Amino acid sequence: MESNEKIQILSDLIQFDSRNGNERPVAEYLKALFEKHGIEAEILPLASDPDHRANLVAHVGTGKPVIAFTGHMDVVDFDRSQWATDPLQLTMDGDKMFGRGVSDMKSGLAAAAIALIDIKEKEIPFDGTLRFLATAGEEVGMAGSTALQAAGYMDDVDALIVGEPTGYNTSFANKGELNITLSAKGKAAHSSTPQLGINAIQELMDVWADIKTKLDERSQKDTNQYLGQDVYNIDVINGGSQPNILPANAEAQLNVRTVPEFDNEAVLAIIDQAIADFNTNHKGEVSREVTMEIIPIEGDLHSKLIQKMQAIAKAAVGKDIKAIAAPGGTDASKLLVDHPIGFPMAVFGPGNFLTAHQNNEECSKDMYLKFIDMYTELFTTVSTEY
């Protein structure tokens, strides 16, 4: 496949407005692309919205080992007025390519798809099966990867490659994440007689103070040598209607990033105990709801997969390739829910992570094309290690 065709495939993907909730057209495009080149692919609609949301699974080869690549088809939202170019058009400026998703992560998706096509058409020999998993909804909720894991598509996988943007590095671990809504019910009263009511905002402040104290104590003790410690913030708070009415209801949204040593379950246990203690000793009522959850993942830093990635990338770019831990989550947290520690998993993909989710998102054209070649070599050689 010529370079201009490789760029055109990425351009085609950028043109799909796949802001979370509209991934099926991307899946249909990839299915047609694969089938044009003799690769069988299957669209798997999501039950929640089958007309607009779907995963895609494709295979090349048969038998063991099974090497899986995963990448997501959705992108984050954008404001056209804040972009220097059309975010739904791939725009070139020298080596820079601009467009929503060009780094996160349609360049990785396109590069892996093209690598499979090259392997198929050139009949490059390899052992086992290459499985391509294109997911819906990674940016919000990870519904696609959750569905693929539940359907058994990870049951026989021996190693997992995640195509999120790392540039010329690779990542083997990421923090987990919890989004938690804290809700407080109080009693309205005139602000001049607060003793007649229950201030719901104050309830939240008191509960959060207790939660934070306990989280601080635990997080300082139970750290991870690669990921550090848990971090947590209240990012949204709502309550009250006007200055002279004691608020009867209040709500706060809490974001927590977790490490294996102080994981989601342990964090929720602390929060639940703090809420129970508060409700026992106060007239108001506080509750919590988990609105999003992914677990922390720690792959094997010394795996054959990472060693192979580092060797291939060093040969391509002439420098040592770092294996790092990342604070952000990926679909691996859902795909590896049954074995989150020690599995041969690595994140390795084209793009500039610093511009992901930003206005004027960009990716290097040279990096994108190099990753196609690196994926082709990786996909066809790493299977000998498993």
Features from the language model and the residues they span:
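Glycine/charged-rich beta-loop-alpha catalytic/anionic-binding loops adjacent to active sites
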Residues: 87-101, 185-186, 314-317
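Residue-level signal for inorganic ion chemistry
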Residues: 13, 17, 34, 164, ...
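Fold-level recognition of mixed alpha/beta catalytic cores in primary-metabolism enzymes, strongest
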Residues: 102-103, 107-213, 359-370
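Short helix-capping segments at alpha-helix termini
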Residues: 37, 122-126, 153-154, 277-283, ...
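Metal-dependent amide/peptide-bond hydrolase catalytic core
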Residues: 179-386
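Acidic-glycine-rich active-site phosphate/pyrophosphate-binding loop
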Residues: 78-93, 156-157, 172-183, 311, ...
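Acidic/His- and Gly-rich active-site-bordering loop/insert found
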Residues: 1-98, 121, 126, 332, ...
